[in-house]
Curated annotation (Swiss-Prot):
Its main location: secreted. Coiled coil: none annotated. Residues 22-177, 192-319 form a propeptide. Keywords: Cleavage on pair of basic residues, Secreted, Signal. Residues 51-69 have a biased composition (Polar residues). It comes from Apis mellifera. It is found in: Secreted. GO terms for cellular component: extracellular region. Residues 158-176 have a biased composition (Low complexity). It comes from the Eukaryota. This is Prohormone-2. Residues 1-21 form the signal peptide.
Amino acid sequence: MMCDWVWLLLTLCSLLMIVQSLPTNLAEDTKKTEQTMRPKSKRAQEMLMFGNQQNHQPENNPSSSYSSTAEKRTLAASGLGGLKAALIEEEKPSRSNTLNNAFYDRKNYDYGAVNELGYEIPQVWDNSPYSRYYTNEDRRKRSEKSAVASGSSTTIKPSTTSFQSPTSTQQSVQTQVKRNVPIYQEPRFKRELDIDPEDVLTLLSLWENERRKRNWHKYMNEEYENVDDEDNLLEEEDSRNIIPWMDSSVYPPRHYSLDSLSPSDIGIIRTHPSSYYEQYENQYGQQYDTSQYGSPQYGLVYPQQTYYSAPEKRFMISRKRSQAYDPYSNAAQFQLSSQSRGYPYQHRLVY
């Protein structure tokens, strides 16, 4: 009895293993055979190219439809040759659709990604990126303004039935991009400010008044009332300190008239004050006009000698020193320590 149960369990296990080993459908079996028959380099290239349909070669190329003799033999032996041909015919329209969409994928990758999701309802891009600075009411106002300005912005799925010309497709892509981009006005950050401008003006005026009219002197005088600032005291003017000659002119004024002017006074450069010879009584002019020197040493610019005179001559007289000459004989009387402090001595030092 036990042997029968054991044989029954073994047969059930073997049946389960056989069922699990069988493929679910013939399509998966053909795919597995294709993968085993292809070399590893082609399989690695296909894995790298997964999802990028634009790099696939079209079906018209004879190299893609060509199969090796070894692959044909294996398919003929397994009886799957007709099934492979049917699968290739089914894959042809799907590949043609991907080729039609390849142009849009090259120009705008997001465009194809949006359309693959299958959105049939028009999408309105009214969400403001400035959610950090605006409230819901402000966002609603901005969305209404942008809707009025730009109209309805929608995404339209391109037709995949017929391949359009390059110029028409480029124009459609550009218009589609323009419609998708939302138009925003310049942000107004002053909406967030809760400060009253009058309060700001009062604060600024108080700050400026505090800088200009500082009243810390008043507080210091209240704290130290009996303190007298010696620097602020002004000495009374003494009548003895007033110098009378500062108010008067340095040289006495000289009034000219047409009768008093001589031709020699016109155009002469004044190198001396007007009352120069009147002050010294023409002592320098008389010195050189005497017959001791004959004629003046230097010629005059004008024939009339009324104002300009020759320069003074200076002579050096050399004397022999005597043996009893003491150059420091008179130095003692000018020393400060030799006389009493009360005596009005001359303020000079001898070196």
